């Protein structure tokens, strides 16, 4: 299981942008099997500009390596179809979660309104959250040829250092649950955390803070899936 810590605003912006892109109606409703290779020219280019240009600088390269580049051509069509099916399965199993397709991957957002949440200043997985993570682990078992990036966030209440540690512990708790309790391979998971530095809502309101206390999961095709898709496409 790989973990890394990066606090720069640039990387935080990358994940904020992922969520922002995913919440656009056009991105949410588009079928990636139909789009095929052209997805690389849209949001993939944005992610490449933010993350890819900083490979090797302050650890950002590892984050970029986890997300990877968009696979184009016929292989991209095949991968898009598989990831579409996985995203649909997750939506069916966990209707409360926010599930969006971004490039070749899937971004899931769990906050206090979607079943996976933490008590104030706590990072243990409660029984209600376990039930949701159990459903997601079943989907991850059904689709084994993916890697998973788990990202923790907090609201702005409390000291910056405390929130950074708290977001780290929460993200690692989710990863540990998948690996230690559900038996998923640790090699599939990378854990990251941003404390309060990447909010998606207004921290001055109770509703906004609840949305910012969240965990994101980015599910991306692994090299096995990519290589098989290239072989099937004759590329």
Regions found by a protein language model. Give the residues of each.
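Periplasmic peptidoglycan-binding/anchoring modules of Gram-negative envelope and division proteins
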Residues: 118-151, 175, 210-212, 217, ...
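Bacterial N-terminal signal peptides that target proteins for export
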Residues: 1-12
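Amphipathic, membrane-active segments
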Residues: 83-114
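Periplasmic OmpA-like peptidoglycan-binding domain that tethers envelope proteins to the cell wall
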Residues: 153-228
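Short, low-complexity, glycine-enriched hydrophobic/amphipathic alpha-helices that associate
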Residues: 26-88
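Short, solvent-exposed beta-strand/turn patches at coil↔beta or beta↔helix junctions
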Residues: 102-134, 154-161
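Extracytoplasmic/secreted proteins, especially bacterial periplasmic and envelope-associated proteins
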Residues: 37, 42-46, 50, 65-66, ...
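C-terminal motif of bacterial Sec signal peptides marking the signal peptidase cleavage site
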Residues: 19-23
């Amino acid at each position: 299981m790989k973990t890394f810590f990066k606090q720069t605003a640039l990387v935080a912006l990358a994940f904020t942008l992922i969520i922002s892109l995913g919440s656009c109606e056009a991105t949410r409703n588009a079928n990636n099997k139909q789009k095929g290779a052209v997805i690389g020219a849209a949001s993939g280019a944005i992610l490449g500009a933010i993350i890819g240009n900083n490979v090797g600088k302050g650890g950002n390269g590892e984050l970029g390596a986890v997300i990877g580049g968009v696979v184009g051509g016929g292989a991209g069509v095949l991968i898009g179809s598989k990831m579409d099916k996985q995203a649909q399965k997750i939506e069916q199993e966990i209707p409360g979660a926010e599930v969006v397709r971004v490039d070749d991957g899937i971004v899931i957002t769990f906050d206090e309104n979607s079943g996976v949440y933490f008590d104030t200043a706590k990072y243990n997985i409660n029984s209600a959250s376990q039930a949701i993570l159990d459903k997601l682990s079943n989907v991850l078992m059904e689709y084994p040829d993916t890697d998973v990036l788990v990202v923790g966030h907090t609201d702005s209440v409390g000291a910056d250092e405390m929130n950074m540690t708290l977001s780290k512990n929460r993200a690692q708790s989710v990863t540990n649950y998948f690996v230690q309790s559900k038996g998923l391979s640790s090699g599939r998971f990378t854990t990251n955390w941003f404390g309060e530095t990447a909010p998606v809502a207004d921290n001055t309101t109770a509703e906004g803070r609840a949305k910012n206390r969240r965990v994101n999961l980015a599910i991306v095709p692994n090299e096995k899936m990519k290589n098989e898709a290239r072989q099937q496409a004759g590329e």
